[in-house]
């Protein structure tokens, strides 16, 4: 089953899917209305009128697919949660992870099902986004999962000392 994930500020397919769902029927091209996509942390998927719309709708219908959206807060927190596991993801993958979490919580994805999340960019391309999340300076975003940055010098002794200070403060 295919799942389409969109940022809430750039969600025309999600809106079309919700319209079809409210009428208890499959998604159709005539459900779609282009939108002017708003600013989103997931800038590469800021698309209000996808050129591949007919293919996307055919794929969703053929696979009994669903469409979900993620808010800016949800995508930012999903990225921070993933970072804590060693996955260093981009905001676009954060949209997918946030939507995945929502679908699991609603039971649309069962715990015994296998899921593949395709990440097309690396977090290193989005270091400013990550640093601002953890510093609590992203506009309109709370940072409940922030891992506060620690300033330190570049000498090994300074790095070791900074690590000890952080660890000692946690004990």
Give short role names for the model-derived ranges.
Residues 3-91, 133-171:
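Active-site/ligand-binding loops adjacent to catalytic centers
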Residues 1-7, 116-120:
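Extended hydrophobic secondary-structure segments that form protein cores and membrane-embedded regions
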Residues 72-128:
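Claisen-condensing/thiolase-fold acyl-transfer catalytic domains that form or cleave C-C bonds
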């Amino acid at each position: 089953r295919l799942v389409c994930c969109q940022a809430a500020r750039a969600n025309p397919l999600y809106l079309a899917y919700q319209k079809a769902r409210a009428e208890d029927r499959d998604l159709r091209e005539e459900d779609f209305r282009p939108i002017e996509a708003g600013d989103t942390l997931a800038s590469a998927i800021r698309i209000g009128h996808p050129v591949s719309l007919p293919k996307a709708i055919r794929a969703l219908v053929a696979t009994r697919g669903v469409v979900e959206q993620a808010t800016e807060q949800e995508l930012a927190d999903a990225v921070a949660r993933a970072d804590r596991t060693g996955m260093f993801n981009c905001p676009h993958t954060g949209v997918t992870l946030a939507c995945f979490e929502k679908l699991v919580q609603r039971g649309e994805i069962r715990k015994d099902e296998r899921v593949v999340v395709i990440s097309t960019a690396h977090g290193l391309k989005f270091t400013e986004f990550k640093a601002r999340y953890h510093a609590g300076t992203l506009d309109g975003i709370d940072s409940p999962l922030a891992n506060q940055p620690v300033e330190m010098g570049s000498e090994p002794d300074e790095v070791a000392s900074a690590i000890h200070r952080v660890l000692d403060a946690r004990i």
